[in-house]
Amino acid sequence: MASPEMEERLRKIIVDQLGVEPEQVVPSASFTKDLNADSLDLVELIMSIEEEFGVEISDEEAEKIQTVADALNYLETHQSNE
């Protein structure tokens, strides 16, 4: 399970990148359907996540990240030790 700190860091990135309210950023939220992100938004979001968490997300993996929970699950298993 993702730590509260990880969730908060991810929430801040999503709010900043997509211009949504923090309350909208729930694990089940779809980036495209619920948070109205387009393909460019998603690319920028993935880049911000990579930078913030020190991970490298392949294009193939990025396509699988559809929801906030998907992003958290990816980070849990791939984040480098800080």
Curated annotation (Swiss-Prot):
The keyword 4Fe-4S does not apply. It is found in: Cytoplasm. Pathway: Lipid metabolism; fatty acid biosynthesis. Pfam families: PP-binding. Carrier of the growing fatty acid chain in fatty acid biosynthesis. Residues 4-79 form the Carrier domain. This is Acyl carrier protein. The modification O-(pantetheine 4'-phosphoryl)serine is found at S39. One of its GO terms (cellular component) is cytosol. It comes from Chloroflexus aurantiacus (strain ATCC 29366 / DSM 635 / J-10-fl).
